[in-house]
Amino acid sequence: MSTSAMELLLTATIFCLVLWVVRIFRPQVPKGLKSPPGPWGWPLIGHMLTLGKNPHLALTRLSARYGDVLQIRIGSTPVVVLSGLDTIRQALVRQGDDFKGRPDLYSFTFISDGQSMTFNPDSGPVWAARRRLAQSALKSFSVASDPASVSSCYLEEHVKKEAEYLIKKFQELMAGPGHFDPYRYVVVSVANVISAICFGQRYSHDDQQLLELIDLNNEFGEVTGSGNPSDFIPILRYLPSATMDTFKDLNRRFSVFIQKMIKEHYKTFEKGHIRDITDSLIEHCQDRKLDKNANIQISDQKIIGIVLDLFGAGFDTITTAISWSLLYLVMNPRIQKKIQEELDTVIGRERQPQLADRPKLPYMEAFISEVFRYSSFMPFTIPHSTTKDTSLNGFYIPKGCCIFVNQWQINHDQKLWGDPSVFRPERFLSPDGTVDKALSEKVTIFGLGKRRCLGEVIGRWEVFLFLAILLQQLEFSTSPGVKIDMTPIYGLTMKYSRCEHFQAQTRPFVLKCPEA
């Protein structure tokens, strides 16, 4: 046999072998269903180059071509990407049990030593019980009323204190340098709110321990948002990685801080005198009961995981929302003035805004909804996974498949919004001036279904109250001639480049009679 014939035979054999291996490992698609469509990908790396620096934009473009259910590969891992409000609601709400899982990603095992409630792949009874416990504790020390305070609830009391501090601080900075970076101060105030709820403790704005913790959280968002190749290319786990080393270290330090706070709470814990979320969780841990039949227990390690999840998520998301809000206010003075006119008319200046004022401030609510939509600062949910073989829109999705949910695409879908690239709060107002609830509920930023963010209600309330108190007293602008870079920086939460050129002037007092 000639050499060329041998080479041809060898090539054909290898091709057949590869084809056989692919067929063996490819899930068998049930009759009547199809595999999700998607673009051609490179060997070994799949579509990693296609995603680039802004995966939300790349996947939005792909969804326009391939539809609301498409499949890509990241490394050797198949990933199904969901877009479109109806499709995502179908998956996460109507078929919520099928899509409530978390992928067992390598990097997730280092968050809370694998005990994180948010990132852990468990989606069974223990996870559900932990989630109910966390939800109950969060409600008890945020939206529940505080009998010792004139505020309507614990959250309102904490936010008012921090907002008052911010007003004073911004005024001091204007009297000094004459400009400032609001993020530097907002993040500490928001962190203090969740710290008071979780630990019953407020920190100084110069406290090095808290500032270090904030830096760790920012790093976490950057590293997690940029993706970890070893999650999808297993062989990389055994090779040196500076990014992975950083990720492990910041999670270790974050856990050490939370463990320290919990140990201090154990030392001073008094049954019947529950001071904060940590005390509430310790009480449940000592009772060893999570359900009415006492079948599910919670360990000390899982307490750390719950507190870490609540604390970490409790200030990054809200700080980012407030930061984008301030940016859009200085870029749109007309909108800022309209919000302040509404505040003056409804509340006046004799008292601070309260949570009870929300229904009477529709333009403020419309503005916040537009901030959430336009910025889409959480472009994706944390990845989901399927808990069983299922189908969606006629496409077969096997058990354990990693699912990306593109929230950015929903919030910029021209079919939903008409002019998604225009910042226009009025879109959320009905002709009679009230909030169009049906439309505002289409804004997707906190996820949907069984994995929906636990703190969504608290987050919305907190953003509203901070902004209302600040805008009642201050008018925000930027230094003359300064241009702000509004380009979002991709991450777990998308932020804009820090800017030192914000200004705030105390609003002149104009006596107006508030509405009855």
Curated annotation (Swiss-Prot):
Q: Which Pfam families match?
A: p450 (PF00067)
Compartmental location = Endoplasmic reticulum membrane; Mitochondrion inner membrane; Microsome membrane; Cytoplasm
PROSITE patterns registered for this protein in UniProt: CYTOCHROME_P450 (PS00086)
User: Which residues does the record list as glycosylated?
Assistant: S63
Task: Write down the superkingdom of origin.
Answer: Eukaryota
Which InterPro entries does its entry note? Cyt_P450, Cyt_P450_CS, Cyt_P450_E_grp-I, Cyt_P450_E_grp-I_CYP1, Cyt_P450_sf
Q: Could you say which cofactors this protein requires?
A: heme
Query: How would you summarize where this protein is expressed among tissues?
Result: Constitutively expressed in liver.
Q: Under what conditions is it induced? A: By 3-methylcholanthrene (3MC).
Q: Name one GO biological process term.
A: progesterone metabolic process
Give UniProt keywords alphabetically.
Cytoplasm, Endoplasmic reticulum, Glycoprotein, Heme, Iron, Lipid biosynthesis, Lipid metabolism, Lyase, Membrane, Metal-binding, Microsome, Mitochondrion, Mitochondrion inner membrane, Monooxygenase, Oxidoreductase, Steroid biosynthesis
Q: What does this protein do?
A: A cytochrome P450 monooxygenase involved in the metabolism of various endogenous substrates, including fatty acids, steroid hormones and vitamins. Mechanistically, uses molecular oxygen inserting one oxygen atom into a substrate, and reducing the second into a water molecule, with two electrons provided by NADPH via cytochrome P450 reductase (CPR; NADPH-ferrihemoprotein reductase). Catalyzes the hydroxylation of carbon-hydrogen bonds.
Report the protein name in the record.
Cytochrome P450 1A1
Q: Which species does this protein come from?
A: Cavia porcellus (Guinea pig)
